Structure formats: structure tokens, C-alpha cells
Amino acid sequence: MQIELTDAAVTWFKNELELPENNKVLVFFVRYGGEFQLKQGFSPAFTVEPKEDVDIGYEQQYDDLNVVVAEKDLWYFEDDHIIVNVVDHEDEISYSTK
């Protein structure tokens, strides 16, 4: 399992979500529905949470940006290499697999 953020995505998260912030982490989680589906009916989403509120199952550092997945959501991301990028003309996050 790997969640890879491009340089553009790291910059986007830092600017849009005002990260890094003291003790806050970028959390990728599973939601029902959505366009990009690794597993049928579900897609990735993200939020910002205090690190102590997340039962961390996966953690990756990008510069000062701490990216995590909770233990309960590992089933969705396991066995996949997800690339998180920014669609330049839409200024939105996009997902793909490697």
C-alpha cells in the first residue's frame, strides 16, 4: 500500500488546508460513492484531524505534511499504489493508480 502525493498535490494541501498545523494530520479515508473507485461503491476522501484522534494504520511524510490512513480504512487502500495529484485547470485533487 502506498499513497503518493505529487509535488503539486503537496503544495495544494498546504495552501488550501493551511497545513502543516500543530499536531494536525491529513487523513485519507473511505467514503461511499464518488468517481474514483478502487473498490466498487467506495472512493477515497480526505480531511484534517488532530493526530491523537486517529488510530493510525499507515503514515507517510511529505516535507512537513503528515499523511495518514486510519487502521479501520486500511482494507480499502491495501494492495494499491494511489497517486494523488492536482488537475491544473480545475484546481481540484485527482486520484489514479500505478
Curated annotation (Swiss-Prot):
Origin: domain of life: Bacteria
Database matches in SUPFAM superfamilies: HesB-like domain
Family: Belongs to the HesB/IscA family.
Name of protein: Uncharacterized protein SAOUHSC_01349
